[in-house]
């Protein structure tokens, strides 16, 4: 057996055995991208199930697990200190972070209240207090490092599918290189 054959065999074995651990998290948003994700899952389940382990996706299952994750998808803007702490925790447990949708990528429309007048802020203060929300809404990237962005409200399906394909290829290549260097 030639060394290149062994490397190829290892790569094939890795691709069959190792699924990417995926997390999907929602913060302040309407969760329209989560709806699009579940619709895409209907179309791509057989393919994705071979390569993705849906470790934490609350819309799909009740028993979710925390990281580590290969990829975490984060939908929604960050509106509270509790959300900021949670998104930092997710970042620490994830190789890659993908900001999903307009609220996560741009902060909007959730952050429209950042432009409110003092009178408008006074009108909504009871809601901010009730939910322990901060005065300002932040993009995910204002709180943590983001590796990929999928814009849109709801998310752009084409960019999402391209991002999934890119991440699967990149992580598998990284795994194969890691295995090869340990030979």
Model-predicted segments: where are they?
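Iron-sulfur-associated redox domains of electron-transfer enzymes in respiratory
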Residues: 3-183
């Amino acid at each position: 057996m030639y060394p290149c054959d062994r490397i190829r065999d290892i790569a094939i074995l890795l691709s069959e055995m190792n699924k990417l651990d995926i997390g999907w998290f929602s913060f302040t948003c309407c969760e329209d991208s989560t709806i699009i994700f579940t619709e895409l899952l209907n179309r791509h389940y057989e393919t994705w199930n071979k390569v993705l382990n849906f470790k934490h996706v609350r819309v799909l299952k009740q028993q979710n697990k925390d990281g580590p994750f290969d990829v975490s998808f984060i939908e929604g803007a960050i509106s509270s200190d509790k959300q900021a702490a949670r998104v930092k925790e997710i970042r620490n447990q994830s190789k890659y972070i993908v900001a999903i949708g307009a609220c996560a990528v741009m902060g909007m429309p959730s952050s429209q209240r950042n432009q409110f007048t003092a009178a408008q802020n006074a009108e909504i203060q009871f809601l901010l207090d009730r939910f322990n929300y901060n005065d300002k809404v932040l993009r995910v990237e204002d709180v943590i490092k983001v590796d990929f962005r999928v814009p849109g409200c709801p998310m752009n399906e084409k960019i999402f599918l391209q991002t999934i394909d890119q991440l699967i290829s990149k992580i598998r290549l990284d795994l194969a290189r890691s295995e090869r260097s340990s030979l």
